[in-house]
Structures are given as C-alpha cells and as structure tokens.
C-alpha cells in the first residue's frame, strides 16, 4: 500500500511545501543515496539539504534513482538547499547555486535559503568545497562586507531565471527580517530556525507567521544531534527523549517522545525536517498527525523553554547574531 500523502503548507508565492521533510544534515556520504531513496519510498517528498552538508551529490543520486524507477517525478519532489557563508557576494551566488544544481542533478531547486546572515571571504570551489569555516587563511575567520540585501537581490534574479522556485532565510532574527523587507522585491517564503522545547522563540515565530512567512524547525529533538557531535552544552543538557514531561505526555497518548516533539511543532503551524537511519523511524517520524496535544500538554511543554540554543555562531568566532 502506498504511503499516505503528507499535508502541505501553501507558501506566500502560491507554491506548496510538504509540512514534513527529511533532513539531510549529517547524512553520511556512504549511505546518503540509499537513505534518501528509502525515504522517498516511505512517502517523504521534501529533502532539506545544504551546500555545507557536503552530501548533495549523494542526495541527488537517491532522488535520481527514485525518479528513474518511476517512484516519483521531479515535480513531486521538493528540494531545499542553502547558500553557504563564503558565497554571499552577488557575483558568487550563481556559482554556488550552479554547483548545487549539478550535484543534485536537477535544473532548479524548490527552495534556496541564505544559511546564515554571515559573509565569509570567498573561497573558490576548486580550492575547497564545501569550505565550512575555511576562509583561505588557515584557521582564521575572514569576513566580507556584503549587505544581506545585496545577496538577496542576487537570489531574486535567480528566481526570475527559473533556477530557484522559492527563496528564504535560515537563522535570521526578527531585526534582520525587518531590514530585508525594506529592500526585497520577493518576500522570503520560509524562515528556518532552531526550534525545540528548550528554545521555543514564540515572538519570532508569531511575527513570521503574521507576515506570511512559513516557519520550518530544525533540531526538533533539541540537544540530540549535538550530543552526537560531543558538544559540551548538549552533553550537559537533559535529553528531551528522556525528559519526564515529554515521556509523560507520550505515555498519555500512547506515543513515543519523538512523535510528541514533532506534533508539538506541527500544532504550532511549523514544518519539521527530522531524519533517521531506521526504516521504522522513517515511518514513525512522518505519522504523528493522528493525535492532538491538549492545552494542558502545551502548557507543560511551554514551561521547558529556557532559551537554550545549540547552534550559535557566537561559539564559532563571537559572531553576535543572537546576542
């Protein structure tokens, strides 16, 4: 039996984006193609990737295999990628996008986000790709004076050229959204942010939704992904999977903690992009829409908010995006 369709959000440009996607961050290159292919077979249609993840070739292979086998068409797949920090200069934006399109083996991406509001020094693709934190000077961070609006204007041109269907931003605070609105011709369709019970960001999410921007949550399970990276802050934070509040709500609804965490975001009108290597979890992570959290559940989860951010550029080089 075919998997049931995933509900979609209508973006402010009229296009539809699945409300549940498959996150490609930290997908191992040796297994990424198979994982993406299996996720498509399990009913996933949105794949959230990025230049910085270093696995877009493999993601593209998984998508291509599914298309070649007739499981899906390109039009049924929603591919998200993100412009990395080294490519913010308008003259480098299309170069970076073309690399993504080549790696994904497609003519366009459905959504292209500015990954962070940070402009590093340009590093040629042939020198190092993805460059990560490399700025051409050993371990030193080197920045370029590129206003966000200039980068945005370059993305708008690529929408008009047909290489991108929707554009948006990631890791932007409200003040930068306001600044972007002053000069943007195309409004951001999506805002992607870290979002979990320890970092609920209610005002930012309320504002984005009020002005017609769809919000996508990453790291819906809180410290989990960062524990796997041995991040000290995450290692010293109680896992949400074992938190008494989350476990009690899960038991009440006969669900597992992951389903509660994803359902909590969904009921806030937020898209989610979990990932899993396990086939049974692939199904579980996209089937949380069959129950409702109560007002009391929400009140209990809201008490867990401690404004604890795990993905903070301040940790890189004292970059003050969220201070």
From Swiss-Prot:
Q: Which Gene3D superfamilies match?
A: NADP-dependent oxidoreductase domain
Which Gene Ontology terms describe the biological processes this protein takes part in? D-xylose catabolic process
Ligand binding (NAD(+))? 219-285
State the EC number(s).
1.1.1.307
Q: Which CDD domains match?
A: AKR_AKR2B1-10
User: Which chain positions carry the site (Lowers pKa of active site Tyr)?
Assistant: 82
Q: Which Pfam family, any one, appears in the UniProt record? A: Aldo_ket_red
The yes or no answer to whether the keyword ATP-binding is present is: no
Q: From the record, what ranges are coiled-coil?
A: none
| Domain of life (superkingdom) | Eukaryota
Catalytic reaction list: xylitol + NAD(+) = D-xylose + NADH + H(+); xylitol + NADP(+) = D-xylose + NADPH + H(+)
Quote the pathway field: Carbohydrate metabolism; D-xylose degradation
Q: InterPro entries annotated for this entry?
A: AKR, AKR2B1, Aldo/ket_reductase_CS, NADP_OxRdtase_dom, NADP_OxRdtase_dom_sf
Alphabetically ordered keywords of this record: Carbohydrate metabolism, NAD, Oxidoreductase, Xylose metabolism
Positions of substrate binding:
115
Q: Where is the active site?
A: 53 (proton donor)
- What enzyme category does the UniProt record give? oxidoreductase
Q: Name one GO molecular function term.
A: D-xylose reductase (NADPH) activity
Summarizing the function annotation, the protein's role is: Reduces D-xylose into xylitol.
Q: Which family does it belong to?
A: Belongs to the aldo/keto reductase family.
- Name by which UniProt lists this protein: NAD(P)H-dependent D-xylose reductase
Q: What is the lineage of its organism?
A: Eukaryota, Fungi, Dikarya, Ascomycota, Saccharomycotina
Report which gene this protein is encoded by.
Answer: XYL1
């Amino acid at each position: 039996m075919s998997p049931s369709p995933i509900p979609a959000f209508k973006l402010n440009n009229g296009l539809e984006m699945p409300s549940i996607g498959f996150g490609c961050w930290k997908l191992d290159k040796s297994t990424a193609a198979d994982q993406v292919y299996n996720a498509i077979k399990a009913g996933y249609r949105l794949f959230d990737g990025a230049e910085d993840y270093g696995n877009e070739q493999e993601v593209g292979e998984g998508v291509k295999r599914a298309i070649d086998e007739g499981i899906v068409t390109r039009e049924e797949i929603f591919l998200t990628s993100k412009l990395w920090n080294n490519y913010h200069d308008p003259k480098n934006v299309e170069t970076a996008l073309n690399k993504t399109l080549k790696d994904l083996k497609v003519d366009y991406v459905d959504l292209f986000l500015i990954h962070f509001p940070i402009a590093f020094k340009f590093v040629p693709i042939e020198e190092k790709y993805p460059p990560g934190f490399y700025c051409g000077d050993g371990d030193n961070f080197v920045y370029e004076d590129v206003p966000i609006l200039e980068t945005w204007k370059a993305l708008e041109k690529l929408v008009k050229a047909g290489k991108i269907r929707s554009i948006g931003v990631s890791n932007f605070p409200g003040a930068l959204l306001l600044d972007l609105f002053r000069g943007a011709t195309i409004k951001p369709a999506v805002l992607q942010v870290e979002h979990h019970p320890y970092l609920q960001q209610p005002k930012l999410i309320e504002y984005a939704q009020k002005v017609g921007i769809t919000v996508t949550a990453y790291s819906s399970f809180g410290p989990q992904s960062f524990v796997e990276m041995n991040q000290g802050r995450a290692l010293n934070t109680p896992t949400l999977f074992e938190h008494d509040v989350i476990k009690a709500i899960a038991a009440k609804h006969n669900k597992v903690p992951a389903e509660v965490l994803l359902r909590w975001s969904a009921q806030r009108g937020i898209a989610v992009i979990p990932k899993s290597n396990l086939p049974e979890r692939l199904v579980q992570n996209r089937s949380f829409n069959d129950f409702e959290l109560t007002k009391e559940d929400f009140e209990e989860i809201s008490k867990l908010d401690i404004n604890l951010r795990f993905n903070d550029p301040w940790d890189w080089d004292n970059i003050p995006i969220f201070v």
